[in-house]
Amino acid sequence: MENLKTYTFDEAYKASLNYFAGDELAARVWVNKYAMKDSYGNIYECSPEDMHHRLANEIARIEKKYENPMSAEEIFSLLDHFRYIIPAGSPMTGIGNDHQVASLSNCFVIGIEGDADSYGAIMRLDEEQVQLMKRRGGVGHDLSQIRPKGTPVNNSALTSTGLVPFMERYSNSTREVAQDGRRGALMLSVSIKHPDSEAFIDAKMTEGKVTGANVSVKIDDEFMKAAVADKPYTQKFPIDSSNPLVEKQISAKKLWGKIVHNAWKSAEPGVLFWDTIIRESIPDCYADLGFKTVSTNPCGEIPLCPYDSCRLLSVNLYSYVENPFTKEAKFNFELFKKHVAKAQRIMDDIIDLELEKIDLIMSKIENDPQCDDIKHAEYHLWEKIKSKSSKGRRTGVGITAEGDMIAAMGLRYGTQEATDFSVDVHRTLALAAYRSSVEMAKERGAFEIFSAEREANNPFILRIKEADPQLYEDMLKYGRRNIACLTIAPTGTTSLMTQTTSGIEPVFMPVYKRRRKVNPNDADVHVDFVDEVGDSFEEYIVYHRKFLEWMRVNGIDTEKRYTQEEIDALVAQSPYYKATANDVDWLMKVRMQGAIQKWVDHSISVTVNLPNDVDEALVNKLYVEAWRSGCKGCTIYRDGSRSGVMIAVSKKDKKKADKEKEVAKDMPVKPLHNVVEVRPKELECDVVRFQNNKEKWVAFVGLLDGYPYEIFTGLQDDEEGIALPKTVTKGKIIKQIEPDGKRRYDFQFENKRGYKTTVEGL
């Protein structure tokens, strides 16, 4: 290992920049997140080509254990340049990496069977959550087994505190765990049947609370029907008991209104339509054998049973469009089917690689110097995970670039025509993946507990039977290698490297404008803007890569300097017109998710992006439509409703806002966003006070056109901190230039008597 060649960051970045054809963000993300490194920060790969050879060689090693193995060269050709098949982050980082003892799984769910509301059970889950996060996994678990607030307990407390304090405990644990420079990811869920579900729903509305977790409510059909019809609904604990300890009737409509309001206000909670999830779940055909689904992974695309895990992989849909953005555009279904079959095979190989990694983790635990009492809990955790992984062999084959595929085919995202085409693609994917799993069952054996009889009435299996009777007959005869196969994940950083839209989502913005500082004396410099201190800036256009391809295909000059009006006109001519994240037809997007969901055996991670000025009635309408359309879950994000999230810069005019509230079909083109890189001398400012690890802090949020532009933070009420009257909530941040040319930022506010006070040097 000491003989391996190492590279500096600059060497790897330069090679990767060339690999990604000048895409700085893609190059930087790859070097920072996915290049093979050791714990000292040494980099052992120069570009993604090195990584793909590493992955191909390891997967080919597993292939040799079985009949008809794929070669390393064939596997590399599928991975190269992120063109066809892209493993998710954990497999990309971990496969063949001997420098880290970490899992290849992207996500886990944990839970305790039986009585799990004791302090011991709650603490056990806390420990297991941390142990998994330190191995790079995201974690989900359900809180429905914790007894509600005020119920008797047999300890000195006399009554239960309810589940909200434990939400905060699990959230804080997440924030403590570092995963290669990022904190852990956590999903907390609770059943709407639980008497504390309202407190759960409100928990994140208090600033600074439960900041380390996503939260989702598991909603059953009975509740949805009661909410729509304004009928009472019964909550109880235990939630599935015929003889509950606690039982109460509530107004379903009122509680539903709170869910809608909170989602509108803060983008949480998400909703999980639990009856749909369980009804459609193939693993739940084996619920009595330990495969009862209890929660989801942090992004919601994989519902899981306790101690099961999943590895993810995406197929780049754009790469199967021949002659993209032309009248001759055609989707190559035959090549797509071949590659999906190989993707499913690669995913099964990655399970074997994960089982090897688990053995290494368990060996490390055994050899750690701690006493056996301390090590036992972690060791037993990985024993349970290994057992579930080998019994079910669950996979997560998904897609990315749906939005670009639709545009390349000359369709508009959010139309019925585009939805119908997408459903055809996902039906093809599902049948090809399941056919591959059946073929592997012939060669490698079915998953350990396969039973055709148990699955006979599962809706997803019945759709396969109707669509491909021969596949169904073969599955009855040979079984299936994997208990479940499919998902659609967000693919955030993955899509940066494929240089496409992410997951099932439309493009965020096809084109936007930026400014960069230039020397006006340099040759070929075009000065578009000079700030108040005399610095010169040049404006330049940033194109979404596939929008740029549309321009090239249609003979549009990509080097020309376009005006704002010309860019708007170009967007209006393109298939990305009215098809960005914020201006698609939102109801059609939800219906599209529901239609595709019928061909995805796990779930789909989708966010419906809404403008800031939509009302709660629209959120309600979208959630109800998601339930009726067969979605397994739904997440709403209203622009500006959550701090720390990228938001749109421009405001929409009043006429368009009125149309959006009615979910209008015919909306004007969204104007080009101008990303301002030169701040004005003064910015309006909001003052936010918060706690960080029990310390009091203050944040100054500079606003440009009413939206966050910059933020300064510091300790308050401390000798070296920032002292402000508690009544101060607004002011100005002023950029100052000192005589020596140094810049500083001052905060200025008015006191109750109208006098201005300035705090220098934020």
What would you call each of these model-derived segments?
Residues 1-104, 256-265, 624, 628, ...:
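Acidic/polar, glycine-rich intrinsically disordered N-terminal extensions of enzymes
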Residues 24, 300-302, 354, 461, ...:
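Catalytic alpha/beta core of large soluble enzyme barrels
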Residues 36, 58-65, 78-155, 163-166, ...:
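Function-dense linear segments that define catalytic or interfacial modules
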Residues 60-113, 120, 234-262, 266-271, ...:
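Gly/Pro-rich turn-and-neighbor structural signature
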Residues 75-76, 236-239, 339-386, 390, ...:
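Internal maturation/activation junctions in enzymes
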Residues 160-164, 174-262, 269, 323, ...:
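Conserved catalytic alpha/beta cores of large enzymes that bind or transform nucleotide phosphates
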Residues 471-477, 648-703:
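Short, Gly/Pro- and small/polar-rich lid/capping loops
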